[in-house]
From Swiss-Prot:
GO terms for molecular function: carbohydrate derivative binding; D-sedoheptulose 7-phosphate isomerase activity; zinc ion binding. Substrate binds at N52, G53, G54, E65, N93, D94, S119, T120, S121, S124, Q172. It comes from Erwinia tasmaniensis (strain DSM 17950 / CFBP 7177 / CIP 109463 / NCPPB 4357 / Et1/99). Zn(2+) binds at H61, E65, Q172, H180. SUPFAM superfamilies: SIS domain. It catalyses: 2 D-sedoheptulose 7-phosphate = D-glycero-alpha-D-manno-heptose 7-phosphate + D-glycero-beta-D-manno-heptose 7-phosphate. The keyword Transcription regulation does not apply. This is Phosphoheptose isomerase. One of its GO terms (cellular component) is cytoplasm.
Length: 192
């Protein structure tokens, strides 16, 4: 009954992945991001991650696999997803939702740390403000974006962009794959 829809969805996902994979700049950006993160950990830094909606879940997934584990047992790496409900509700109420991540970055981030900001459109005001706060703190920035990069285009040290202009879920599917590859590469880089 739904077989055509299922095939269509999987084919669209495969097409999105293949388009992303065909651009060597994406491969190079993933490698640069992994090395940047590992170098920060080796120097005593940490990573803060943030996103909205499904991207918020991806930011949490990213931090969890750094502090917990990916495929192999190893020491945890310092990572914090900006997801504390009391912080988010306090800042939303007192300052506005645009500041929920930047206030945390200002309080906790320091030079030598990295911010991973996820926005499928590249236009999320609260992610952009977090990037600005990270820059003010002397942090490095990695952005996972989509479409044409939106307003985040050019703001990060490393941008990994999924050039898909349809629904955001296709972009998120590539983002989670990128996150898993980052885990694998960070683990390899940390034992060099």
């Amino acid at each position: 009954m739904y077989q055509d829809i299922i095939r269509s969805e999987l084919n669209e996902a495969a097409d999105t992945l293949n388009k992303f994979l065909s651009d060597e700049a994406n491969i190079a950006a993933i490698q640069r991001a992994a090395v940047l993160l590992a170098d920060a950990f080796k120097a005593g830094g940490k990573v803060l991650s943030c996103g909205n909606g499904g991207s918020h879940c991806d930011a949490m997934h990213f931090a969890e696999e750094l502090t917990g584990r990916y495929r192999e047992n190893r020491p945890g790496y310092p990572a914090i997803a900006i997801s504390d409900v009391s912080h988010l509700s306090c800042v939303s109420n007192d300052f506005g939702y645009d500041y929920v991540f930047s206030r945390y970055v200002e309080a906790v981030g320091k030079a030598g740390d990295v911010l991973l900001g996820l926005s499928t459109s590249g236009n999320s005001a609260n992610i952009i403000k977090a990037v600005e706060a990270a820059r003010a703190q002397g942090m490095k920035v990695i952005a996972l974006t989509g479409k044409d990069g939106g307003k985040m285009d050019g703001l990060a040290d490393v941008e990994i962009r999924v050039p898909h202009f349809g629904y955001a879920d296709r972009i998120q599917e590539i983002h989670i794959k990128v996150i898993h590859i980052l885990m694998l590469l960070i683990e390899k880089e940390m034992v060099k």
